Each structure stands twice: as C-alpha cells, then as structure tokens.
Swiss-Prot record:
Its EC number is 1.11.1.6. The active site is at H72, N145. The keyword Cell inner membrane does not apply. This is Catalase. It comes from Vibrio cholerae serotype O1 (strain ATCC 39315 / El Tor Inaba N16961). It is an enzyme of class 1 (oxidoreductase). Decomposes hydrogen peroxide into water and oxygen; serves to protect cells from the toxic effects of hydrogen peroxide. It is found in: Periplasm. The lineage of its organism: Bacteria, Pseudomonadati, Pseudomonadota, Gammaproteobacteria, Vibrionales. Keywords: Heme, Hydrogen peroxide, Iron, Metal-binding, Oxidoreductase, Periplasm, Peroxidase, Signal.
Length: 503
C-alpha cells in the first residue's frame, strides 16, 4: 500500500483502485489544517482558546451519549421485510395483512430488559422483540418479548417492579433479596417467573427464540367488526437456549454472543426468518374464558393460531447509533385496523413508551431516518429542538378555510360498549397460579431440573426466610411437585410452605 497526500493506491493482484481521500472538516464544513497538534502560545506555552477545532472536538465528545433506555438498554437491530401469507381483510384493514404476498419493510430491535447497556448478553432476563412495520398507513410498532406473559398486570406497578429488579441504590448491585421481596407481594408474577427461570431466560441466539406481543390488541375490519388478537412470532430456526452450565461457559468466552451471532449469520447470507401467527377471539368468546383474557400474566390456552405472514431479516445496520440506538418503539404507534385492548398494563405502556422516547430523543424523533414514516406526515406539531422539517405555511392550526387538511372519519376509533362505574380495584378472577402449573407440567424432566436449578440459585441468595418461604409457596400452589422440589433445593421447610400455600 502506498499513501500520498491525496490518494490511496490499493493493489489487489492485477487490479489497482484509486480512492481520493476526502478533506477532514469541522461541523460547519470548514476544512481542518492540523488534526494532530493543538494551537499553543509558543512551543512550551498554554493551549489557546482560539483553537476552535480542538474546542469543538472536546465539546462534541462530551455530548456523544444520549440517555440510556430505562429498560431494554442493551440491544441490537436488523432490517428486513414482512410478507403476508394471505388476505386477512375480513379481520383487519391494516395494510400489512390485506393482500397475499404484500411486502412491508421492517426494522427489529432485540434486547435484554433489565440490565444496562454493555452488560453481558448471557444474563437471565426476558428478551425484547420489537418490530417496526413501515406501512403506507404509517409506522406500526409491535413491541413484545420472547416470553408470552409478563410479571404484572397493572401498569401502576411497573415502576416498582423495575426498581426492584434494577441494581440497589445503595450498592449498585442487582439483589434477589430486593426483587423477590417485591414478587412475594405479587402472586400474579408466578407464571412469568416460571417462564424466565426456564432456559428460555438465557437464549443461545436471537435467531433461535420466539417473540410475543404479550398483550391482546383489537383488529378492526372495514365494516367496523372487532376481534381481539394476540401475536406470536415463531422462529423457523427452531428454539435453542443455554442450560445452566452453558451460560457460565459462554459468558467466559463471549458476553456479546447474541449480537455477534445475529450479525455474523446475516452477513454470511443466513437470513433468519419468523412466521407470524395470531390468535383471534370475538368479544363474546373473550368474555367466556375462565380467566381474564386481558390479563398480561395469562396466555390464551387452547385458542388456535392462524399464520398471517413471514418476516426475514436480511441486513445489519450501517451505523449502530443512528439506527439501533436511535430507533424508538412504542405500542402507541398504531395504524388503522389495530387498536389497543383494555389490558391495564398495555394502557400504561401506551403512554410510558412514547414518553420515554421523547425524553431520550426529543420532540422531533420521528424526523430521524430510522423512525421516519414512509408516508408524508401532515400535522401541526411544530418547532422543538433539532427540528429539520420543511415548513413554509402560515397555517399551523386546524380547521382552517385556507388549508385543506382534514380528518378522515373512516379512521375514527371503534365504539366500545362500557358497563359499570369508575372504580379502582384489582381484577376479578386473577387465577394467579393456575397457568404456572400448566407450564411446569408441560416441561420435560430435564427442563424441570434446569428450572429448579436456575430458580433455586437466586432464591438461595435471599436472606429473609419469610420472603423465601412465601415465594416457594407460590410455586407450590402452582404445582405441588414444583414447590416440593424447590423447597428441597432451597432448604425451605415444606410444612411451612404448605401452610402458607393454604392461606
């Protein structure tokens, strides 16, 4: 390789390629004369404030970081496409599902949930599975996880739950004493805890895990008919997770194993695929379930699934910060034909996720290329920091006789019949333990053993015997064999566990 002032000459066999080097500039476009030495007052004098290039470099360096996501901080993304497997316009007027073979561009961000940016990807955690569909009706975000349920059912407990799972404000260490103290007061968490302490809580690859929308949503068709749906991404690569002994081994070799695997496989042309399935219930069918079908701690048991399309991820981001880090997902990013259900956790997420993105990225986050819709945006939202919109009109209000910008009545929210009165109380028929037992009994013996090993490992770090016994009693109520084996693994008195379970 030979380098001159203006050119790089690269010889490869019989091929020579000349690349003219671009001139280094400051942010205002002015060329830089010396990027190696500061301007000083003489050879041994102080650095001068007039060295605007130096000052700008230091200023920009100090401002490179934006606020970390409060949850889902560690993540990786990929571009791809979703192809509809049929015409489902009888169920929804949402663009991705209205014609067979319809192609919709997507961007997916996988993530851990609790742990910070830069933390090992081997840590036990649910995994975020967020998909942004760029449709001709606007952007739709399906913001889910790799597990089908969640720890809580009401968003009023979300900050408390996250605080308990995050590091202690005293030691800055995650502490099972703290989060099991919280969960001992939340029996509805039993189902999700069972899921996350299986080996699914430590996936071997983002490619080899499923994804779930977790919540129920409403699908609305052109006639205004309403059905409730749940979404399920099924990995066509199969399901592969790390067993307890494998977690330690992998972490010692590569604590970025999920990101490395996804990037390596996509760049090698091994593009991962997921089929998207939906479960569909009419409002009447939903009301007849023997549990609350709008409870985020529940799955819809024995409700058939319908395949609606396939997603392929085929390109890694050109720049991590510009695309993956600045991508902003929120369940409130909906399009015609999809509306939120009355799920209490989802209702809170509609606000919280959109609000945290405004905090991270500012009011004009939708102008960032990764978040920008394919369709033209016509709104009177204006100004704010870092606004690059092209606005010349004098009319920034609606309605106006001077500007034809009007709403379209066909996209009004669907009418929902209400019953009862304003109230503040827990849901009826919570059935906190039943589905955790169903899950436990569905596991093979090896998976049961790994579940007990994983769960007991953290419970054995709990120093308060009452908290530990209460937690074991929750799992005992889900399934006696489950609780008995866990009591044995944690040296917890089984008689005390049975007594607590009977209360």
């Amino acid at each position: 390789m030979h380098m001159s002032k203006s050119f790089l000459i690269i010889s490869m066999g019989f091929v020579a390629v000349s690349v003219q080097a671009q001139t280094l500039t400051r942010d205002n476009g002015a060329p830089v004369g010396d990027n190696q030495n500061s301007i000083t007052a003489g050879e041994h004098g102080s650095v001068l404030l007039q060295d605007v290039h130096l000052i700008q470099k230091l200023q920009r360096f100090a401002r490179e970081r934006i606020p970390e996501r409060v949850v889902h901080a560690r993540g990786t993304g990929a571009h791809g496409e979703f192809v509809a497997s049929g015409d489902f316009s009888d169920l929804t007027l949402s663009a991705p599902f209205t014609s067979k073979g319809k192609i919709t561009p997507v961007f997916v961000r996988f993530s851990t949930v609790i742990h910070s940016k830069g933390s090992p990807e081997t840590l036990r955690d649910p995994r975020g599975f967020a998909t942004k569909f760029y449709t001709e009706q606007g952007n739709w975000d399906l913001v889910g996880n790799n597990l089908p349920v969640f720890f809580i059912r009401d968003s009023i407990k979300f900050p408390d739950m996250v605080h308990s799972l995050k590091p202690s404000p005293v030691t800055n260490l995650q502490d099972p004493n703290r989060f099991f103290d919280f969960f001992s007061h939340e029996p509805g968490s039993t189902h999700m805890l069972t899921w996350v302490y299986t080996n699914l809580g430590t996936p071997a690859s983002y490619r080899t895990m499923d994804g779930f929308g977790v919540h129920a949503y409403k699908w609305i068709n052109q006639k205004g008919d309403v059905n409730y749906v749940k979404f399920h991404w099924k990995s066509l690569q199969g399901i592969e997770s790390l067993r307890p002994d494998e977690v330690v081994k992998v972490q010692g070799q590569d604590f970025n194993h999920l990101t490395n695997d996804l990037y390596t496989q996509i760049n090698a042309g091994n593009h991962p695929k997921w089929d998207l399935y939906v479960q569909v219930l009419t409002p009447e069918q939903l009301s007849k379930l023997d549990y609350n079908g709008l409870d985020a701690t529940k799955v819809w048991l024995d409700v058939p699934e319908k395949k609606v399309g396939t997603m392929t991820l085929n390109k890694v981001p050109d720049n991590f910060f510009l695309e993956t880090e600045q991508s902003a997902f929120a369940p409130s990013n909906l399009i015609p034909g999809i509306e939120p259900s009355e799920d209490r956790l989802l209702q809170g997420r509609l606000f919280a996720y959109a609000d945290t993105q405004l905090y991270r990225l500012g009011a004009n986050l939708f102008q960032l290329p990764i978040n920008r819709p394919l369709v033209e945006v016509n709104s009177h939202n204006q100004e704010g920091a870092s606004n690059s919109a092209q606005t010349a009109s004098d009319i920034n209000y609606q309605p106006s006789r001077k500007l034809e910008l009007k709403e379209d009545p066909q996209f009004k929210a669907v009418q929902t019949q209400l019953v009862g009165s304003v109230q503040q109380k827990a849901i009826s028929n919570p059935r906190n333990f039943y589905q955790a037992g169903v899950l436990y009994r569905s596991l093979n013996e090896q998976d049961k053993q790994d579940l007990i090993t994983n769960l007991x490992g953290b419970l054995n770090k709990v120093t308060d015997k009452e908290i530990k016994a209460t937690m074991v009693s929750h799992f005992y109520r889900a399934d006696k064999d489950y609780g008995t084996r866990l009591a044995r693994a944690t040296n917890t008195d089984l008689k005390q566990v049975a007594k607590l379970a009977a209360m």
